[in-house]
Amino acid sequence: MTDKYENPTSDDYMGVVMGIIMSGGNAKGLAFQAIQQAKAGEFAEAESSLNEASEQLREAHDVQTDLLTRLAQGEKIGWNLYMVHAQDHLMNAITFKDLAVEVVGQEQRLQALENK
């Protein structure tokens, strides 16, 4: 059992929380950037931004999965409002990225129709 997950006030635990928040924020920013790029007709760049967003989300999701696995195995995992906030950031970023994929696709379709 590791202390970094048991004590929700430890620096290690808060580092994990901040990592999830930062990855979620980065992913959401990249997804928004992808939408802006698509609106400008920069579809390769938009795809690249979406791929980077996916990587940020994967990193945060890996930490989340590790925490859930440890909890399922009976380890004591401390929780506080910061962790709840981190999970909220992550889920919002995942949803925003999923919607950004749809918006980029619609923008491609719209621009293709306009260019006919």
From Swiss-Prot:
Description of the deletion phenotype: Disruption of the gene abolishes growth on cellobiose and lactose.
Induction: Induced by growth on cellobiose. Negativelly controlled by the CcpA regulator. Also induced in response to galactose.
Alphabetized PROSITE patterns for the sequence: PTS_EIIA_TYPE_3 (PS51095)
SUPFAM superfamilies (alphabetical): Enzyme IIa from lactose specific PTS, IIa-lac
UniProt keyword annotations, A-Z: Magnesium, Metal-binding, Phosphoprotein, Phosphotransferase system, Sugar transport, Transferase, Transport
Domain of life (superkingdom): Bacteria
InterPro entries linked to this entry: PTS_IIA_lac/cel (IPR003188), PTS_IIA_lac/cel_sf (IPR036542)
Active site residues according to the UniProt entry: 85
Molecular-function GO term, any one: metal ion binding
Cofactor note: Binds 1 Mg(2+) ion per trimer.
Gene Ontology biological process terms, A to Z: phosphoenolpyruvate-dependent sugar phosphotransferase system
Chain ranges of the PTS EIIA type-3 domain: 11-109
Entry note about domains: The PTS EIIA type-3 domain is phosphorylated by phospho-HPr on a histidyl residue. Then, it transfers the phosphoryl group to the PTS EIIB type-3 domain.
Protein name, as recorded: PTS system cellobiose-specific EIIA component
Record organism: Lactococcus lactis subsp. lactis (strain IL1403)
Gene for this chain: ptcA
